[in-house]
Amino acid sequence: MKIEEIKMIYIDEMIGQEVEMDEFSQMEATEEIAMKIEEKTLDMMEKDLEFMERYPNPTYAVLRLSYLVGSEDMENWKKLQEMYEEKTLLNHLKEIQNQAVDFIKREKVKMMKAQGLTEKMKRENPEEYQGQMNNLMATVKRMAIKEYVEA
């Protein structure tokens, strides 16, 4: 059975249980519902001025939303739909953003120390320092994505 068929069965079950889904009742495809959830959630995120001021580019929140929307895993689909219906999706995404950014800050310091990236190195060999910092940041960001976005 294809994931689309499984998702439609799940949606049919939810409708059968009289779960509030009025806004999706005219939609036929699961993908259409997922895209609508994504669109509405991004709109709500943009309206949260405090959050947007703190994170003008909420990369990890948006990546997490995209991950849940595009996931082939039935558990992720259920999680997305339940959080949306319970109105906890936006808070979940904001928390993912906070956790990922905090993780990056902590790990960056640890990894800089472990790799010997010091102010002295920055002054004496700026090109080497910059290259190593670029690699370090790419690694830390990949770690954050694995730990928080794809968890």
Named regions from a protein language model:
Residues 54, 70, 86-97, 126-134:
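Conserved phosphate/pyrophosphate-binding and hydrolysis machinery centered on Walker-type P-loop NTPases
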Residues 33-48, 97-104, 133-137:
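Short amphipathic alpha-helical coiled-coil/interface segments
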Residues 85-122, 139:
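Active-site helix-to-loop segments that bind/position phosphate- or nucleotide-bearing substrates
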Residues 38, 92, 147-150:
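Aromatic-enriched hydrophobic runs in primary sequence
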Residues 1-79:
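Oxidative protein folding and maturation machinery
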Residues 58, 62-74, 110-151:
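C-terminal charged interaction modules
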